[in-house]
Amino acid sequence: MKILVINCGSSSLKYQLLDMDTQTPIAKGLVERIGLPGAVLTHRPADGEKEIITAEIPNHTIAIQLVLDALVNPEYGVVKSLEEIGSVGHRVVHGGEKFASSVLITDEVMQAIEECIELAPLHNPPNIAGIEACQKLMPGVPQVAVFDTAFHQTMPPHAYLYGLPYEFYEKYKIRKYGFHGTSHKYVSQRAAKLLNRPAEGLKLISCHLGNGSSITAIKDGKSIETSMGFTPLEGLMMGTRSGDLDPAIVSFIQQKENLSSDEVNDFLNKKCGVLGLSGVSSDFRDIEQARDQGNYRAALALDVFSHDVKKYIGSYAAVLNGADAIIFTAGLGENSAEMREAVVDGLQYLGAKLDLEKNKVRGKEADISAPEATCRVLVIPTNEELMIALDTLDIIQKG
């Protein structure tokens, strides 16, 4: 079976068409600047040259129509007809408490996703637009929703509740939801295979480190604690997000800078993190380069970030009562040997120790632990598209 995976942002759309017999992509691509001037589709067949298609793309329906046209194009397409596509898997950012797993999309499911809009006002509307476009353009093809939050629905109440009046949870559903769930789920399954152990009995700490970063404690294949919270702003300091703060700082900044609540929220999401601390960039590669050129603030930002990661690993080791493995994934986790070394240095008490030669790996699955390490350190490139496709296939096969 071939499965199309769709990930819609407000003005962008990423897609992959996967052959589930081999679990590999046949084509992938990106539509940029939806609803804006200069819209473009970059289409990459797995065994061909990339095609760049410019067009007026006023909305997600037109964007998906262009993607489908590209997939069947006689010149650079990869399937003879759309009938070869057995199902579509959609990334949906927020499923609230309603969804603890991926689901076949029905009218009731769509209504529930719409009810989660206030929890993810920037993300769920374009996710919905993508689903509606596919329903219109591919009638009769099963559509599946895969939620970023679903994997974390196994967290116990003592992990997901905040120190607020319980009525606020009942009235407004204020609680920790967690994100990057599809990524954490994928790498935890790969880790079990790499370690040649069943998920049951395994204690894993998964570090998804990139422009957005989160850490998850995984026990018996299930998430029991995670660093992102009610929104993706909580937890680690990130590319442009502040991460954990004393809540009183928010009103203090509002008063000092004369900001509205929307403005301060925008500030904490887009102008803080390593960008704010370094004054250089939100891209860790740029910051590492600036640090190497003697930039004090760049060095400071990297130190704060690695300290943050180490602190969360320590607290999750406490929650798990030890750890069998620490996983590094996503852009920074997969590619920065320096960051991995800075994080693992000082975790000897956990039994974690790097082999510095093996740690030079970039973007490939590897066990980078020293032979004597009792807590393994793994690099596992994430593959959210494959995880979405596997979940979609599972649901279609179950009928």
Swiss-Prot record:
Subcellular location: Cytoplasm
Pfam families: Acetate_kinase
Predominant subcellular localization, coarse grouping: cytoplasm
UniProt xrefs under PROSITE patterns: ACETATE_KINASE_1 (PS01075), ACETATE_KINASE_2 (PS01076)
Secreted in keyword set: no
Annotated site, Transition state stabilizer, chain positions: H180, R241
Involved pathway(s): Metabolic intermediate biosynthesis; acetyl-CoA biosynthesis; acetyl-CoA from acetate: step 1/2
Protein name listed in UniProt: Acetate kinase
Native source organism of the sequence: Desulfitobacterium hafniense (strain Y51)
Gene name of the record: ackA
